[in-house]
Amino acid sequence: MAKDEIIEFEGEVIDTLPNTLFKVRLENGHEIIAHISGKMRKHYIRILTGDKVKVEMTPYDLSKGRITYRGKN
């Protein structure tokens, strides 16, 4: 997949699910299921309910995404 096809959104974690999955409400109001990117997992970055995050999505499946950044609170 080419980098230019990735869609990036900001959102807020509203629920934590098993296996490092999270329910995220995007800034446009949609709710998606997102997982942590590999670098965040490698560096043990913790994500909690209420955190502001940046999510990458593909145009092929707009119900799933990858969390790439956790905002500083």
Swiss-Prot record:
Q: Where in the cell is it found?
A: Cytoplasm
NAD: present as a keyword of the record? no
Q: How does it assemble?
A: Component of the 30S ribosomal translation pre-initiation complex which assembles on the 30S ribosome in the order IF-2 and IF-3, IF-1 and N-formylmethionyl-tRNA(fMet); mRNA recruitment can occur at any time during PIC assembly.
CDD domains the UniProt entry points to: S1_IF1 (cd04451)
Family according to the record: Belongs to the IF-1 family.
According to the UniProt entry, its GO molecular function terms are: ribosome binding; rRNA binding; translation initiation factor activity
The family database entries (InterPro entries) matched by this protein are listed as: NA-bd_OB-fold, RNA-binding_domain_S1_IF1, S1_domain, TIF_IF1
The answer, when asked if Protein biosynthesis is one of the entry's keywords, is yes
Q: Which SMART domains match?
A: S1
Stated name of the protein: Translation initiation factor IF-1
What function does the entry list? Answer: One of the essential components for the initiation of protein synthesis. Stabilizes the binding of IF-2 and IF-3 on the 30S subunit to which N-formylmethionyl-tRNA(fMet) subsequently binds. Helps modulate mRNA selection, yielding the 30S pre-initiation complex (PIC). Upon addition of the 50S ribosomal subunit IF-1, IF-2 and IF-3 are released leaving the mature 70S translation initiation complex.
Top-level taxonomic group: Bacteria
Please report the organism this UniProt entry assigns to the protein: Psychrobacter arcticus (strain DSM 17307 / VKM B-2377 / 273-4)
Q: Mind listing the UniProt keywords for this protein, alphabetically?
A: Cytoplasm, Initiation factor, Protein biosynthesis, RNA-binding, rRNA-binding
One GO term of the cellular component aspect? cytosol
Domain (S1-like) ranges = 1-72
